[in-house]
């Protein structure tokens, strides 16, 4: 999906902002002799950025606004190096809440729902993202945070939670505990918004069946606001993403060239109106594809397919590139295999 004229102008404005701010990113653009973009060709010639680049800006080098305009920071986990610190202005926080509100609305969630939020809070974007969007929607939020399953189930029963926001692994744990404790008839859940982890069809069906709820995939990453930049609809045929806030292109992860709509590749995201820390052509390493055509739900927003894995998940087996998602596609054909499995690669005689 080629960048349109409006998006191109927005990217150009983001570039001007970064250069003027003389931030880490602005200096990088100057080093490449970039002063702006006015065509698709200009845009596709822009350099990519990656998490390893952003770590070089630690702690606040990505900040593209005066400090008095920054109201919050979030960060990546930093498990493989320095964390990436992302500053937010008040407008960024509000824009994120607006996008998340759209996610809830796309999932058929209303201000009459009671939304139980189980992902973590703090520097991580997940918990507060789910909460801000629910408050923008006008729904009741039950801000549980992670763990403490006994308390989670008590609040779920006593407060009559109707929406569960969770990772796939924790929602499965809750489903198992609800069954084990005989609480199924006391639970009022009707929908689940699931993110942060890739999950297969078998796991999805198991959670849906055991909890008796509709499930929706939500997409996002800390560097680009957080969760809430896209979500699946009731037709479950991809995730609608908000192309008035972000531009998504799919590239060949080896050549870096854009691929046609419908072809699998790496997701690359550019922010269109972010203030605190704009990002241009950010390589996510997530694998997906743009789904061509309109969705049955009638939404005007384009769609990404479910995340199929990551470029850094790839294994090379006897010279063949293999992704865990490809193995999962084969395993799901066997009904006797559960949603949980382990991949072990044996090396015999050095092969």
Regions found by a protein language model. Give the residues of each.
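Active-site glycine/GP-rich loop and adjacent strand/helix microenvironment
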Residues: 1-17, 23, 137-351
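Nucleotide 5′-phosphate-binding alpha/beta core
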Residues: 1-75, 80-98, 102-106, 110-112, ...
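Proline- and acidic/polar-enriched loop/turn elements at helix boundaries
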Residues: 30, 41, 89, 116, ...
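Acidic/glycine-enriched edge-of-secondary-structure segments
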Residues: 81-95, 131-141, 158-165
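Short glycine-enriched loops at secondary-structure junctions
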Residues: 93, 120-122, 169-170
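Conserved AMP-binding loop of ANL adenylate-forming enzymes
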Residues: 104-139
């Amino acid at each position: 999906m080629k960048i349109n004229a409006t998006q191109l102008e927005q990217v150009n404005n983001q570039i001007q902002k970064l250069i003027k701010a003389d931030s880490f990113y602005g200096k990088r653009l100057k080093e490449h002799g970039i002063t702006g973009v006015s065509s698709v060709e200009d845009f596709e010639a822009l350099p990519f950025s990656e998490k390893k680049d952003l770590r070089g800006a630690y702690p606040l080098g990505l900040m593209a606004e005066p400090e008095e305009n920054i109201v919050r920071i979030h960060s990546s986990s930093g498990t493989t190096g320095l964390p990436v610190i992302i500053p937010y202005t008040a407008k960024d926080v509000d824009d994120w809440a607006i996008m998340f509100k759209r996610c809830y609305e796309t999932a058929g969630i209303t201000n009459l729902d009671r939304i139980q939020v189980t992902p973590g809070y703090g520097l991580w974007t997940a918990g507060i993202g789910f909460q801000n969007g629910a408050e923008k929607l006008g729904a009741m939020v039950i801000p549980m945070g992670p763990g403490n399953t006994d308390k989670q189930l008590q609040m779920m029963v006593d407060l009559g939670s109707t929406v569960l926001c969770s990772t796939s692994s924790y929602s499965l744990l809750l489903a198992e505990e609800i069954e084990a404790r005989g609480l199924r008839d006391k639970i009022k859940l009707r929908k689940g918004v699931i993110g942060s982890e890739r999950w297969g069809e078998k796991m999805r069906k198991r959670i849906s069946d055991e909890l008796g709820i509709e499930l929706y995939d939500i997409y996002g990453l800390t560097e680009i606001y957080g969760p809430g930049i896209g979500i699946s609809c009731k037709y479950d045929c991809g995730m609608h993403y908000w192309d008035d806030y972000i531009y998504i292109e799919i590239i060949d992860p080896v050549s870096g060239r854009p691929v046609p709509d419908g072809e699998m590749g790496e997701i690359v995201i550019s922010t269109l109106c972010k203030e605190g820390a704009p990002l241009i052509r950010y390589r996510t390493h997530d694998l997906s594809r743009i789904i061509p055509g309109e969705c049955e739900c009638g939404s005007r927003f384009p769609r990404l397919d479910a995340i199929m894995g990551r470029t850094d998940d790839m294994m090379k087996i006897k010279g063949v590139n293999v992704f865990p998602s490809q193995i999962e596609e084969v395993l799901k054909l066997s009904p006797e295999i559960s949603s949980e499995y382990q991949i072990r690669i044996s090396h015999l005689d050095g092969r």
